[in-house]
């Protein structure tokens, strides 16, 4: 009888790990902004595609920093300010784009300076219970695709 319990656990765990790869959410592109070694914070910018039902990005984490928070930029009294937000909507069969001029993931309390070209692991968590493990490269803002696409707006 004990062998059936063990077999059941193995099948259950195999089912859980297989479902982790069946995500409808995919990273299209992204990067982490390179900062001087003396600066303890940076930001991640990315585009996610959702091939399923609508959900929300509710948190991010990375082992290279104390915390990662969802932030947006708002204009208040003529000044642009950063604000923490609880979630970013990811529409059904749509995209979520986080870029320098708006929504982004603020990475705070870096444990060590990040190097250009370094690959940084990050886990994104969604309101529907899904998680997405991604890797973002540290890039200079001038080399990043989003900076090139939006450079003429500044």
Language-model region placement:
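Compact, glycine-rich, soluble single-domain proteins
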Residues: 24-154
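Well-ordered, non-transmembrane segments within structured domains
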Residues: 2-4, 16, 125
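Bacterial N-terminal signal peptides that target proteins for export
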Residues: 1-11
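Bacterial N-terminal signal peptides
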Residues: 9-19
């Amino acid at each position: 009888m004990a062998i059936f319990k063990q077999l059941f656990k193995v099948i259950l765990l195999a089912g859980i790990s297989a479902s982790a790869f069946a995500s409808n959410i995919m990273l299209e592109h992204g990067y982490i902004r390179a900062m001087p070694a003396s600066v303890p914070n940076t930001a991640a910018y990315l585009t996610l595609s959702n091939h399923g039902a609508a959900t929300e990005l509710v948190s991010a984490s990375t082992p290279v920093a104390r915390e990662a928070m969802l932030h947006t930029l708002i204009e208040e009294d003529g000044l642009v300010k950063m604000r923490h937000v609880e979630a970013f909507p990811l529409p059904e069969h749509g995209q979520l784009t986080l870029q320098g001029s708006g929504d982004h993931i603020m990475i705070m309390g870096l444990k060590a300076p990040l190097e250009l070209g370094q690959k940084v692991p990050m886990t994104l968590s969604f309101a529907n219970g899904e998680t997405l493990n991604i890797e973002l490269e540290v890039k200079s803002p001038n080399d990043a695709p989003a900076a090139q696409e939006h450079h003429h707006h500044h």
